[in-house]
């Protein structure tokens, strides 16, 4: 099969599907219309599919094959964001937007599925197509990854479009691969502080949760600065601080939420433990009650080295000038990691930002946009890899 030629035949459909999905975003696990659209397309392609997992569509090419089983994954959910791109196919749904590229991921997997289905007689093996919900919640892959169905898979592949690599000198249209640790954990923590409220003019009568919160916020940065090697990438960030309702009242409580990003189980455990110890120690110092919780969301994305090398070889057959190896991990997280905890695989990137008003906007921004010119590269690489591995 001439993979690039076959993919180019479906490129117009790829863009059409992506635009339809972009106009009609859905959130989390509530993807009824998206799932219906995907399932109908798979039916058109003659691909067996089911919706037995919450918010997901699973398809199979050559389901009866006893050969090697490769899973291809695309996520489908959007974000609770009001779109401000001004694109002709902008979101039609108030307060919802595909601001992280999942519309493209879904369309790209459909394109790969269509081509592979048309050439299924040339394939000695089975292909599992995972159209996944709720990546943005960090939990959409768990049910599938833990299933008996997924346990039969030998390898799993996925990709992310967009501008996650902005600022690294990566050219548009680049296909970026990483061996080993590739993306960080996406953990969350909460800290609740209970002090004693008082009038703002009488701080001596208070146990001030705002002051205590400030000590906690600054002190936990010592975990990164003084307890972990500077060669080990670690992030501790606060995203929510809630306390008080009046300018002249010291409140009784404060609430903090944040995220940690790590790349190894050992550092993950250390950060989780020390966050709690520091918060509770500061609370004790200032006579406040502390409630601390740490939520382990997606683990690190750790690519299989051999599979990544084979994916790079496949990509170089099609786009020899566009393949780049990433030498440092990205501290963003991805629930694709739950698949990689179960089976070997690889997660790669397409760098395809589109400027709005002359600027490239970050993922999750209301003006985030992607260039469609390069979107065909992802299904092309997936199909080439499958044919290299399973082609007769």
Where do the model's predicted regions map?
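Histidine/acidic-residue-rich, glycine-tolerant segments that coordinate divalent metal ions
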Residues: 79, 87-97, 104, 121-240, ...
